[in-house]
C-alpha cells in the first residue's frame, strides 16, 4: 500500500534564520520529524544554493522554505528524480500565474535569461537508498531590486509589473 504525505504538516516558521536547509538537516539528524514538515522564514541570513553559492533576498519578499522528505522508494542513483519533480512543480506553479519559465538543470528556474528561483536538495543516504531529502526552494516573489553582483535575477513582481 502506498502512503501519502501532506506537505506543510507541520510547518515551522521563523522571522529570521540562518538557513532553512541547515535547520531541516539538524532536525533530521537529531530527531524524527514528520515527512512533509516545512520550514519557512521571512529572511535567511545565510541562504545558499548549489556548490556553496549564496542565496540573497530582502526580508519578507520571497518564498524561502525547506521541505523534509523521506523518499525511501528511491535508490541513491535516482536522486536526480527529486530535482526533476521539484523543478517541474515550481514551473507548474508559476505557470498558474501566467509566468512562462524554463528550467536550467539541475536546479534553477529562469524567465528568459533571468533567474527567478533556485532549488537546493540535500540528501541523507542510507546504504543504497535515500533516507531523507531536504528540498530547499528560494523563489523571488515581491522583490523589486537586487544587490549586485547577482547574475540576472528577477521576481514575480518584476515580471508581472504589479
Language model: regions and residue ranges:
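N-terminal lobe of the biotin/lipoate ligase/transferase fold
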Residues: 1-96
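Long, positively charged amphipathic alpha-helical accessory segments at protein N-termini or as interdomain linkers
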Residues: 6, 72-77, 81-101, 111-162
Amino acid at each position: 500500500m502506498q502512503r501519502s504525505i501532506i506537505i506543510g504538516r507541520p510547518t515551522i516558521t521563523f522571522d529570521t534564520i540562518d538557513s532553512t536547509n541547515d535547520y531541516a538537516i539538524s532536525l533530521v539528524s537529531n530527531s524524527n520529524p514528520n515527512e512533509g514538515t516545512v520550514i519557512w522564514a521571512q529572511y535567511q541570513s545565510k541562504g545558499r544554493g548549489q556548490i556553496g553559492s549564496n542565496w540573497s533576498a530582502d526580508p519578507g519578499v520571497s518564498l524561502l522554505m525547506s521541505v523534509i522528505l523521506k523518499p525511501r522508494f528511491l535508490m541513491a542513483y535516482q536522486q536526480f528524480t527529486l530535482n526533476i519533480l521539484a523543478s517541474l512543480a515550481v514551473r507548474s506553479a508559476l505557470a498558474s500565474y501566467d509566468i512562462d519559465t524554463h528550467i536550467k538543470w539541475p536546479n534553477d528556474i529562469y524567465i528568459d535569461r533571468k533567474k527567478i528561483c533556485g532549488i537546493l536538495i540535500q540528501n541523507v543516504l542510507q546504504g543504497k537508498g535515500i533516507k531523507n531529502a531536504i528540498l530547499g526552494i528560494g523563489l523571488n516573489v515581491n522583490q523589486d531590486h537586487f544587490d549586485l553582483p547577482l547574475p540576472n535575477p528577477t521576481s514575480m513582481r518584476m515580471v508581472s509589473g504589479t
